[in-house]
């Protein structure tokens, strides 16, 4: 039985993780959980249902209320609380389903304590890929990706020798603005952007999908996750979102993972690997006609892919800067302070002006993060 610490239990990934735990109670047990979002009612419902040994909350008012409602449960507060949850003796696997880099210290400490990591958080590897990879290697920790694309690549690479691999290929739906012309892109609204044709995601991720920044982040993530320095990592547009990742080998063969666009599939495999359990969702129905289309990324429309590749070339502080600057610009767009086109225009300007420097510690990463946020707010 795997004993889980779930960070971000009320978010989309967290809720589906608990759905799998609910389906397989003999395989998984929730030891601790944290929610730093606003859905306090749902979090309390989760605490009642799964009765973890401990939980963490984000402020003192919520902490006091939680302690009163659950007097026999241990509660922790703030960022330090995340670390306490993750390093509990009985925890075997940390499910990092929260967004942002707030959970980075907790994740690093959990790996030092020998905890397995199921990772849904793009920012952790984008900002601290070198540090996380080094910590995982030193402590013999295998990082199991939850993102559908990286989970697909992980499955394609299982049992393969590095020498035979030529390319890692991430697929992108193209987002809600795929078929709009360059002229139309200049006047898209927030509602246009948030109406994703395939995936039901949070606002920030949906905006990232529209700019393809999410795919840029995933290219960086794949580099650190798989450690294949001499292997090309690229993205292609695949509007149907049925194939999630592909590996091309030196002999020209391509292996892919295919399933309906539902995050439950990769979440479940990240939790059960290398075993496979029955899914509550229907798989592919090949009795019906299926269409698979692939298009190259138009870099004039989506400079985010080029920016991500430059991050990998420069490394150092560039990943943290790229991630933080984008977060602020997306927030400004959602607040209707800037246009959709401004996101990529301003992000490109910021990245061109950033002078890359070495970034080896958690303190370095947080310093870059703060610098980028301040500049992105002003530009």
Curated annotation (Swiss-Prot):
Binding positions (Mn(2+)): 147, 149, 218
Record carries keyword Translocase: no
Pfam families: DXP_redisom_C, DXP_reductoisom, DXPR_C
Cofactor: Mg(2+); Mn(2+)
Swiss-Prot/TrEMBL GO biological process terms: isopentenyl diphosphate biosynthetic process, methylerythritol 4-phosphate pathway involved in terpenoid biosynthetic process
MF GO annotations: 1-deoxy-D-xylulose-5-phosphate reductoisomerase activity; manganese ion binding; NADPH binding
Residues that bind 1-deoxy-D-xylulose 5-phosphate: 122, 148-149, 173, 196, 209, 214-215, 218
Alphabetically ordered keywords of this record: Isoprene biosynthesis, Manganese, Metal-binding, NADP, Oxidoreductase
Domain of life the protein comes from: Bacteria
Catalytic activity as recorded in UniProt: 2-C-methyl-D-erythritol 4-phosphate + NADP(+) = 1-deoxy-D-xylulose 5-phosphate + NADPH + H(+)
EC code: 1.1.1.267
Enzyme class of the recorded protein, top EC level: oxidoreductase
InterPro entries given in the database record: DXP_reductoisomerase (IPR003821), DXP_reductoisomerase_C (IPR013644), DXP_reductoisomerase_N (IPR013512), DXPR_C (IPR026877), DXPR_C_sf (IPR036169), NAD(P)-bd_dom_sf (IPR036291)
Sequence positions that bind NADPH: 10-13, 39, 121, 123, 202
Pathway(s): Isoprenoid biosynthesis; isopentenyl diphosphate biosynthesis via DXP pathway; isopentenyl diphosphate from 1-deoxy-D-xylulose 5-phosphate: step 1/6
Family in the record: Belongs to the DXR family.
Chain's role: Catalyzes the NADPH-dependent rearrangement and reduction of 1-deoxy-D-xylulose-5-phosphate (DXP) to 2-C-methyl-D-erythritol 4-phosphate (MEP).
Protein name as it appears in the record: 1-deoxy-D-xylulose 5-phosphate reductoisomerase
Organism from which the protein derives: Chlamydia pneumoniae
High-level lineage: Bacteria, Pseudomonadati, Chlamydiota, Chlamydiia, Chlamydiales
